[in-house]
UniProtKB/Swiss-Prot annotation:
It comes from Mycobacterium tuberculosis (strain ATCC 25618 / H37Rv). GO terms for biological process: symbiont-mediated perturbation of host cellular process. Is completely inhibited by anacardic acid, an inhibitor of HAT activity. Its main location: secreted. GO terms for molecular function: chromatin binding; histone binding; histone H3 acetyltransferase activity. It is an enzyme of class 2 (transferase). GO terms for cellular component: extracellular region; host cell cytoplasm; host cell nucleus. Physically interacts with histone H3 in infected macrophages. It catalyses: L-lysyl-[protein] + acetyl-CoA = N(6)-acetyl-L-lysyl-[protein] + CoA + H(+). This is Histone acetyltransferase. On the 2D-gel the determined pI of this protein is: 9.47. Keywords: Acyltransferase, Host cytoplasm, Host nucleus, Secreted, Transferase.
Length: 76
């Protein structure tokens, strides 16, 4: 299913921080993983290098645009 968002290969920012995503673990050294299972691979979770640890989840919608808050589909 496609949600119309950039894939990891299309989004350099997402690739850089893909270790934060539960689907692509292991590359975000020092960042805490999210405990939720998100069905959308574009979610980055836990500490964000810009916004800090108060931001629990965010969805990448562009190279430098970060949407912060609840998941539009699951409400998580």
């Amino acid at each position: 299913m496609s949600f119309g968002f950039p894939t990891f290969s299309q989004n350099r920012f997402t690739e850089q921080y893909s270790g934060l995503c539960p689907i692509a673990p292991g590359r975000g050294a020092g960042l805490q993983p999210c405990r939720r299972d998100c069905p959308v691979a574009r979610w980055l979770v836990a500490d964000h290098p810009v916004f800090g640890s108060d931001c629990r989840c965010r969805m990448m919608v562009g190279v430098n645009r970060v949407r912060i808050g609840r998941h539009e589909l699951t409400g998580a």
